Amino acid sequence: MRKPQRGYARQDRVKEQIMRELAELVRTGLKDPRAGFITINEVEVTRDYSHATVFYTVLNQDTREITEEVLEHARGHLRSELSKRIKLFKIPELHFKYDESLERGMSLSALIDQVAAEKPVED
């Protein structure tokens, strides 16, 4: 007999919930005006839920370093607020990493456009 398929693995559901809640907390809970406009792109959680790596980007690249400092400083507060919103046995320790995939994608796109512009048009 076949086992019924599960829609989402629990770890995936937890990752998505952490991502949603952190996005809301960062938007409404960070009071530091130095922080730029922060977007939470992805969350990776270890199997035992002890650590979560949060990938983020900022709208203004000039505020990238300051935003990193603000997030590191607010890490404990954000974890505490997460514990009030998410019912888990263990709330993961948060680690913030700037998501460079967007920048890499844009530079690759620019390189492709450059090569396409240099290539002569064939009739």
From Swiss-Prot:
Transmembrane regions listed in the UniProt entry: none
Cystine residue pairs: none
Complexes and interactors: Monomer. Binds 30S ribosomal subunits, but not 50S ribosomal subunits or 70S ribosomes.
Gene Ontology MF: a single term: ribosomal small subunit binding
Family: Belongs to the RbfA family.
Localization per record: Cytoplasm
Keywords assigned by UniProt, alphabetized: Cytoplasm, Ribosome biogenesis
Known function: One of several proteins that assist in the late maturation steps of the functional core of the 30S ribosomal subunit. Associates with free 30S ribosomal subunits (but not with 30S subunits that are part of 70S ribosomes or polysomes). Required for efficient processing of 16S rRNA. May interact with the 5'-terminal helix region of 16S rRNA.
Record-linked Gene3D superfamilies: 3.30.300.20
GO CC terms, sorted: cytosol
Name of the featured protein: Ribosome-binding factor A
Coiled coil: none
Pfam families, per database record: RBFA
SUPFAM superfamilies tied to this protein: Ribosome-binding factor A, RbfA (SSF89919)
GO biological processes: maturation of SSU-rRNA
Annotated source species: Neisseria gonorrhoeae (strain NCCP11945)
